Amino acid sequence: MLNLIKKEIALCMHPTAFIFLFFAVLVFVPNYPYEIIFFFSCLSVFFSCMMTRENGDIAFSCALPVKKEHIPFAKMLVVFGLQCIILLLVGVIGAIKGAVLPAEQYVNQAGISANLVLVGNGAILLGIFNLIFFPCYFKNPDKIGVPFVIGAVVIFLLISVFIALRWATSLYSTTLNGLNSENTGAKLVALVIGIAVYVVLSAVTCKLSMKNFQRVDL
């Protein structure tokens, strides 16, 4: 499994998978829908799967002395790792922003502020994208566009919901917005819920994707 993961990183990861990690600094952009940052992580998955297809990596991997179900599992583990890194970076850089900027400049007028709740929201977005994209992709690894478009549409709809909640509910506009030092307990609960959703959805994603890939005739 470790060798498969190394192979994924060396041969299948598109450069954008690493470049887009630096987009976490977008939390310093004032009045910006920060959930968009996580869409770029989804976009890097699309580019990496395209690279996998163009390099004929699936057929190559199936010729290796490994279990067939380990092939999708290794790819997803690499993606999950990169997603956890972007979540961590957004949380850390958001905390730095809160420490160096005045409170009135920290509050985001275009959505939730760069706090723990944003990380929880991002975890939910990434988990849902994984659940939509990977099981469909591993049914037919040559067909990448449709699963990605469906996943992207759902992601942007959810981002719109998060933005609407920022203005429609006092929970999002007051309690969950602003600095982490304000209403910390509520923000931690939102973070834990988001991470829990991500873990559950990722586990389901792995199970469905591995099952679907077993049926692929290469």
What are these model-predicted stretches?
Residues 70-72:
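Alpha-helix N-cap/helix-start motif at helix boundaries, enriched for small hydrophobics
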Residues 1-58, 74-218:
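Hydrophobic alpha-helical transmembrane segments of membrane proteins
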Residues 60-62:
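Juxtamembrane/interface alpha-helical elements of multi-pass membrane proteins
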